[in-house]
Amino acid sequence: MITTQMWHFYVTRVGLLLLISILPGTTGQGESRRQEPGDFVKQDIGGLSPKHAPDIPDDSTDNITIFTRILDRLLDGYDNRLRPGLGDAVTEVKTDIYVTSFGPVSDTDMEYTIDVFFRQTWHDERLKFDGPMKILPLNNLLASKIWTPDTFFHNGKKSVAHNMTTPNKLLRLVDNGTLLYTMRLTIHAECPMHLEDFPMDVHACPLKFGSYAYTKAEVIYSWTLGKNKSVEVAQDGSRLNQYDLLGHVVGTEIIRSSTGEYVVMTTHFHLKRKIGYFVIQTYLPCIMTVILSQVSFWLNRESVPARTVFGVTTVLTMTTLSISARNSLPKVAYATAMDWFIAVCYAFVFSALIEFATVNYFTKRSWAWEGKKVPEALEMKKKTPAAPTKKTSTTFNIVGTTYPINLAKDTEFSTISKAAAAPSASSTPTVIASPKTTYVQDSPAETKTYNSVSKVDKISRIIFPVLFAIFNLVYWATYVNRESAIKGMIRKQ
């Protein structure tokens, strides 16, 4: 049974409900609420759901607020551990490189340094948005919250991402879900070198990069602008002292490993060594040393000290040059073009020394002055002892000149050379007196003699220069033609 108090409670409640329904600005059940001017924040902005659009003041309708909400919506539920298109399609990463500086190149370590802007572009359906701007520049901090390619450099020994004053990274998001990710890198990459043609050698230093974990069934790489324009080198980007950058060749490779097949992007930078330094430092000194060694062929064969100095000095000089030429090279097990040149020059210098030894050995008994052989040609005539005089004469007369005889020291016949020849044109007998016996000897015929020139020297004066000239002609012609062929091959590629 309903009491009076309960009846009054129900009547009061019904009355309040009727009063609320009659008041303006209220809606009954089934009626739509009238939109007020300040209620726009509750609508979808750029695809935002009402739960991501909290109430804000009426004056906060600028782009910053709009894109803040866009980013909040995009990252809500985004899993950066999963690549775009997982399970549906292969993710394509487009790349291009702008080289700001190339070099230096280390021959001993067989590596080079390159500074680049490395750009990557890919599409992520999860990051599509609709807003007042088509391209949204983002801070580099957002890169850690989204999926990015796990690109690494296959032949990189050391890579540095620049962080001064902030990380040198750029991230842009297009409204269709395309991302551009750029970073500045300094890469120390390996450059295999074949030094057989050193210092006229040409090298192709590679730069290889690709995905570390994703096979070609998951992630593939391609060049953004094609093979001809995707790698660009700044005009003032060369930092090479000993090389010329001839050009670069862009390509793509597939490598196979135990974990699958991977796409590898390749760029080969072709370098040509500058030979000027080595011409001044090695080639010219070697050539001058060989020429100096051949000067000894024009010296008298009796000039033993002079010719010995020429030979020994030039051999030691070539030894020093050969050692110094190897200091700037890695310790390779094969001979380079410079090694062959130095070896041939060393052979010429050493041959010149051997030539002098040969000439000296076979001609040492036929030296110049014929007067030294006079004692063998003298006709000794023993005369009857002269009548003794009161005083034995201790002097003898040679062509009107009186010389004292030292009986204690001159026990043998003295050698008479051209310096003691008579100035008279006639041949006058010379009388040699002694206390007991008088000898009469005929003077040698006055014939002026000269130092004879060895036939070996005469032949060497012609053979050595001609052979050395032919060697230089063949040597330089071979490597100059090879350089032209290599440059033509690079242009075709």
From Swiss-Prot:
Glycans are attached at N63, N163, N176, N228. Residues 31-42 have a biased composition (Basic and acidic residues). The modification Phosphoserine is found at S427, S434, S443. 4-aminobutanoate binds at R119, T182. The chain crosses the membrane at residues 277-298, 304-325, 338-359, 459-480. The modification Phosphothreonine is found at T428. One of its GO terms (biological process) is chloride transmembrane transport. PROSITE patterns: NEUROTR_ION_CHANNEL. Its main location: membrane. Residues 27-54 are annotated as: Disordered. Residues 1-28 form the signal peptide. It catalyses: chloride(in) = chloride(out). Residues 29-276 are extracellular. Belongs to the ligand-gated ion channel (TC 1.A.9) family. Gamma-aminobutyric acid receptor (TC 1.A.9.5) subfamily. GABRA3 sub-subfamily. This is Gamma-aminobutyric acid receptor subunit alpha-3. It comes from Rattus norvegicus (Rat).
